[in-house]
Amino acid sequence: MTNIEQDRWSRVKGRLRSSVGEDVYSSWFARMDLESVQPESVHLSVPTRFLKSWIQTHYSDRVLSCWQAEMPQVHRVDLTVRTAMRCAAPAKDAPAHAEPRRDDGRPAPELRATAIAPVSATHEALGGSPLDPRLTFGSFVIGRSNTLAHAAARQVAEGRRGDPVMFNPLYIHSGVGLGKTHLLQAVTWAGNSGTERKVLYLTAEKFMYGFVAALKSQTALAFKEALRGIDVLVIDDLQFLQGKTTQAEFCHTLNALIDAGRQVVIAADRPPSDLESLDERVRSRLAGGLVVEMASLGEDLRLGILKSRVTAARAHHASFDVPLPVLEYLARTITHNGRDLEGAINRLLAHSKLNAQPVTLEMAEREIRDLVRPQEPKRIKIEDIQRVVARQYNVSRSDLLSSRRTANVVRPRQVAMYLAKTLTLRSLPEIGRRFGGRDHTTVLHAVRKIEGLVAKDTALSDEVELLKRQLQE
């Protein structure tokens, strides 16, 4: 892809993000890539058939119009599914330290298992989603941003049948490329390493397809019984779970497994409270377990990932070397996720080998230019707003959610609602729901009230600006 095409693609993504909103964009378009640009057509790709079908059904016109705003001559946008790698299982006896350590959910392609062990019969019989043998605990890079998630996942994986279940469900959420899938597949591999427990890994897409297929073939009862007979259910990308009937079945399965003392592990790109498409009962059950956020990769962790990626590449390219100053430069400038870090090393490897040149800082600056993105605004959560406002006005968060009408509570509540409307993409009904189940008209009144006061009251205006700065830091 040329720099011109990359710039166009960045602008199109910006238009699309503005058009559909941050939440819809992160759910459906964050993993869409540009493959090629022709004079009158554009070729895009996504990783799954489900994403392709959903985007084509609901957003094809929107995507085309965003491209036509950039290139009026474009009349067609083609969307295809990127070829997925279906890997065999890892060697049971492979030592953990022999695997290069990664954190981005997609480790070095050069790594290969030295021996092949079969995937568990349960996983295959129930049509489990494909597992990558490189996504194990041994290849996971641990840093401050993921320590708790790793420790919780490890404890779940090391449990035995009949042990008390401590974290149920274990719910891990983070942005794209921060290691959620890596941890979930690591739990699956570790759980399947013996014959004692039945562990099943499914993407939300796979769960939907499996349930719909069972309904069509009139085998829904067998599908339900099989799922509820396993010991550990691992569900990835829960934000893609769609359809009332499917969600109801997922809720029943979740309740049945948890009530029976079986383990459930789930990953999504947002906390349970932000999964607005899910039924309130499901969100409540998910929030009742251990909810862990994997934060953005710190610079030290990014440097560790880069070093491990270089080590992995040397297994097949012994002369490949990246000087430490170059790695430090990459760690400082590529800040979004581990997949961009992997892409940077792949580019340096290709350039070095194809041109028979050593890797230099100048080469790195040139080759990764399009991976250095402007810093995106911090995503602010309503819970953060409530916490910061409560602290500022010396009230509790429960006061903000309560029905109390005393002056020392009403004003902070109105300020918090105003900030929720101005700093997030949440709708008025959603904001009202998050403030103790209030009506959207109550939120609208609060927003207009604070807007009017801020225009006249300098002290309140300064307070609101201070709160905004605290939330955006």
UniProtKB/Swiss-Prot annotation:
Q: Which CDD domains match?
A: AAA (cd00009), Bac_DnaA_C (cd06571)
Disulfide bond sites: none
Asked whether the keyword Transport is assigned, the reply is no
Q: Where is this region: Domain II?
A: 73-129
Q: Which residues of the sequence carry a binding annotation for ATP?
A: G177, G179, K180, T181
Q: Name one GO biological process term.
A: regulation of DNA replication
Q: GO CC annotations? A: cytoplasm; plasma membrane
User: Origin, by domain of life?
Assistant: Bacteria
User: Which controlled-vocabulary keywords does the entry list?
Assistant: ATP-binding, Cytoplasm, DNA replication, DNA-binding, Lipid-binding, Nucleotide-binding
Any one GO molecular-function label of the UniProt entry: ATP hydrolysis activity
Q: Where in the cell is it found?
A: Cytoplasm
Family, according to the entry, reads as follows:
Belongs to the DnaA family.
NCBIfam families for the chain: DnaA
Record's subunit section: Oligomerizes as a right-handed, spiral filament on DNA at oriC.
This chain's protein is named Chromosomal replication initiator protein DnaA
